[in-house]
Amino acid sequence: MKRAGSRVVPALAASLALALACCAVAAPRDNINDWAWLSDIEARRRPPFRIFDNVAYVGLDWVSCYLIETSAGLILIDALYEPYTETLLDNIRALGHDPADVAYVIVTHGHWDHAGGAATLQEKLGARVVMSAADWDLVARDSSSGNTRFTPAREDLALGDGEILTLGDTTLTFHLTPGHTDGSLSVEFPARDGERTWRALTYGGVGINFSDPEKLKTYSDSVRRIMARGPFDVNLTNHPGMAWVFPLARDLAARQPGEPHPFVDPAAMAAFLKQRLAAAASS
């Protein structure tokens, strides 16, 4: 597989202008067939846009996928789901890249909307797929049942708390944050803006989809652990509506030279984590 170094492509201002509406999407019902919008390709697609010099958004209107550019290839955070893998590949091409340069696909947790496209990317691109050991087990157990079934990726790399992955000039650090799933994996990575480099985080599983007291404690403990490992400067959530990704993209498109980067906001990140603790306490 080709492992060419990534090119730095100018920001897609026109694409940013189109990516304006932040989605607030309810969780799917038990019967996925009641939600035809999930497979409405034209309605769900969004043009890709650059967030930092080395980070771009290549996801949908309701579920995120981030492209990290390194000196030795590309990394994806999350894999979307079918029928959107071709949309994802088109978004990568629109940024001036060859999808064959994707070396790793990091899956934040094993639910269908984040892991469902990993098998196709693994097959088409030869990319290595990374998940936590617990969520590799989750995918093996649950991907073939129910209305959200999907073809799982072949089990590949299992990374855990504190482990790192380096590709070229970029190192990712993984934080195991169980709660949303038993193996939700948060990803820390550098976000570069000119001469500045910021600490960015994609939290592994934000939603509280349970009410069991022990699971709520596990979720809260994970959030506190991330807070202790901060501060983090940039909050790039795996659902864009969780942290106003599209409105911030609008602000970024209007940014003037010398103005602060709208996605860099350690206080907002800290408030987001405190809000997750409050949500768990009230669940």
Label the model's feature ranges.
Residues 54, 68, 78, 109, ...:
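Divalent metal-coordination and catalytic microenvironments
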Residues 42-95, 99, 186-206:
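Conserved beta-strand hairpin/beta-sheet module of binuclear metal-dependent hydrolase folds
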